């Protein structure tokens, strides 16, 4: 398999040069892309995020939860997710809080979950291996059988082979790692849990040998192999962004297939510019959008994030997780207290990952900044949103063939015959003609991200469709801006959702309305005097009694808006 998985022909078709909508010149050539449909195509398990917020709801205001977190999750509806969860000392209160979040998000989207309990505790000489694993299994038993969190499908022993403060500790203590994994496997079987082990959950090319070792020593108890990759040096547009992910995963896919297994890209991300981990007295774990807001780098690295996902898709990975869905909150201290609020905060600190008091972990699609009440989106929302929404689990991959080194392409078909295509253009604005071996049953909706003018939205709504394009015999042409990404899809239903009823101002100064009975409803948009003032999953909005003409519209899972 070749890097960039392409072979294409760039046709020098004689046609007049054109100008794109943004005023940039468009190449007079037409770049040809062919989507092939091999007899045997690999099954895709879905893109998703590390949903760190799933254990952090006690820290959220109602406004942040309903208007940003739940609203954005339901709009994207990821079909795969990774969560720091499954702790051996997880409290009933914290598990119930997680189960409530599960009901509000994962259950609605049918999201498959991969759990990992952050970092394992330090392995001491008297560590109780069997007791630890039994405690994990008992808690998962409660979540699966009592709370009915049945989409918990995978579990990894620890994040990136870490033990306590030592990242990668198990890479040099593999005998201990194996002993614990086998004890976990036995505990899950005793409890009748259909939860497969993901091993080794290691990271970086330096530790690929952990995966090789696991295939030789843990294949009998491993459900899926797992590896992480971060790019901290490449620049947007460099071929290495795609090629490094594609190359490493192609080799790992082959290795794991030889053991009758598949591999997951358990985390991926890109920071770039060789940024040091430490800045001043704190650790910097932020992406470009947080470090350099709305800079050219931040606007373009949002494309890189999706580009790395396409590399995983085309390399044959089972699924892939982008770190993270929402920013972590600002650092805070871990300490118990007497009030319910203090105890909830203590549980969040214990069960949400390592180093919450020293890290600025800002890698989300949108901000979590309580101090400044800033929950706005990063450019990443408008590349990753549709990648995760449209490239969902249960799809099969179409192999793209082309020869333009400035393009990146990915495509899938779904069991209902619908198809989604993603195209990245790192070159000058150009016309691309796509020929698909899979027929397009209806016009394709088009969603575009132009890094020169990202489609930012004050309420974190995904960008509306730019329009539709009609294919003839599986062929359509489109013009792509420079350094941009576009999605084309027949995975939609064209409809008008039922209107929202019962809109009125309550006596407490809040606007209220009736719950939508539409099974495809996702969230509400609220308008005053024709201007949108909020997006929310709630049926109440505090407008402080402000006078005006109010309207509430329902948005369904395909982005259709009611009247």
For each of these PLM feature ranges, what is it?
Residues 542-561:
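Beta-strand-rich modules
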Residues 492-520, 557-563:
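Pro/Thr/Ser/Gly-rich low-complexity, intrinsically disordered linker/stalk tracts
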Residues 464-495:
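C-terminal beta-strand-rich structural cap/linker in extracellular carbohydrate-active enzymes
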Residues 270-391, 395-408, 415:
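Aromatic/acidic polysaccharide-binding cleft in carbohydrate-active enzymes
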Residues 174-315:
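Noncatalytic carbohydrate-binding groove/subsite architecture in carbohydrate-active enzymes
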Residues 402-442, 446-451, 483-487, 518-519, ...:
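Carbohydrate-binding surface patches
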Residues 444, 524-526:
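Short beta-strand elements bearing conserved aromatic residues within extracellular beta-rich modules
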Residues 71-236:
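Substrate-binding cleft and catalytic face of glycoside hydrolase catalytic domains
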């Amino acid at each position: 398999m070749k890097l960039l998985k392409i072979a294409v022909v760039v046709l020098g078709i004689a046609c007049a040069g054109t100008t794109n909508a943004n005023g940039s010149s468009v190449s007079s050539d037409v770049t040809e892309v062919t989507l092939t449909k091999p007899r045997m195509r690999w099954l895709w398990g879905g893109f998703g995020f590390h949903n760190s917020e799933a254990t952090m709801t006690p820290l959220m205001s109602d406004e942040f939860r309903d208007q940003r977190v739940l609203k954005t999750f339901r709009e994207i509806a990821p079909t795969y997710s990774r969560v720091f969860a499954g702790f051996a000392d997880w409290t009933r209160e914290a598990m119930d809080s997680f189960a409530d979040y599960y009901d509000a998000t994962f259950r609605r989207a049918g999201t498959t979950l991969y759990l990992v309990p952050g970092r394992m505790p330090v392995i001491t000489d008297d560590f109780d291996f069997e007791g630890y694993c039994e405690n994990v299994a008992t808690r998962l038993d409660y979540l699966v059988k009592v709370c009915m969190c049945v989409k918990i499908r995978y579990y990894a022993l620890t994040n990136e082979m870490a033990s306590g403060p030592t990242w990668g500790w198990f890479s040099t203590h593999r005998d201990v790692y194996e002993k614990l994994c086998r004890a976990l496997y036995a505990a899950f079987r005793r409890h009748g849990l259909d939860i497969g082990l993901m091993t080794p959950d290691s990271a970086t090319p330096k530790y690929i040998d952990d995966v090789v070792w696991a295939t030789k020593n843990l294949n009998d108890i491993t459900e899926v192999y797992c590896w992480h990759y971060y790019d901290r040096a490449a620049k947007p547009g460099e071929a290495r962004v795609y090629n490094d992910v594609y190359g490493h995963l192609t080799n790992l896919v082959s290795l794991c297939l030889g053991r009758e297994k598949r591999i997951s890209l358990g985390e991926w991300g890109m920071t770039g510019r060789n940024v040091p981990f430490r800045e001043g007295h704190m650790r910097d774990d932020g992406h470009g959008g947080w470090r350099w807001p709305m800079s050219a780098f931040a606007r373009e690295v949002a494309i890189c994030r999706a580009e790395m996902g396409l590399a995983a898709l085309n390399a044959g990975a089972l699924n892939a997780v982008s770190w993270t869905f929402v920013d972590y909150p600002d650092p805070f201290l871990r300490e118990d207290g007497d009030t319910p609020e203090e105890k909830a905060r203590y549980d969040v600190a214990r069960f949400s990952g390592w180093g919450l008091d020293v890290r600025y972990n800002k890698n989300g699609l949108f901000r979590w900044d309580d101090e400044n009440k800033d929950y706005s989106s990063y450019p990443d929302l408008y590349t990753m949103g549709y990648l995760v929404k449209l490239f969902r689990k249960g799809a099969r991959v179409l192999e793209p063939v082309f020869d333009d080194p400035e393009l990146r392409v990915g495509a899938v078909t779904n069991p209902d015959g619908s198809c989604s295509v993603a195209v990245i253009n790192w070159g000058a604005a150009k016309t691309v003609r796509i020929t698909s071996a899979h027929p397009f049953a209806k016009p394709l909706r088009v969603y575009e991200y132009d890094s020169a003018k990202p489609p930012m939205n004050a309420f974190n709504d995904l960008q509306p469709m730019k329009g539709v394009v009609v294919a003839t015999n599986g062929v359509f042409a489109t013009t792509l801006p420079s350094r941009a990404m576009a999605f084309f899809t027949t995975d939609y239903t064209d409809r008008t959702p039922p209107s929202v009823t019962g809109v009125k101002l309550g006596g407490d100064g809040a606007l209220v309305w009736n719950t939508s009975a539409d099974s495809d409803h996702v969230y509400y948009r609220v308008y005053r005097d024709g201007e949108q003032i909020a997006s929310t999953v709630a049926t109440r909005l505090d407008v402080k009694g402000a006078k005006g003409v109010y309207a509430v519209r329902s948005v369904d899972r395909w982005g259709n808006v009611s009247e």
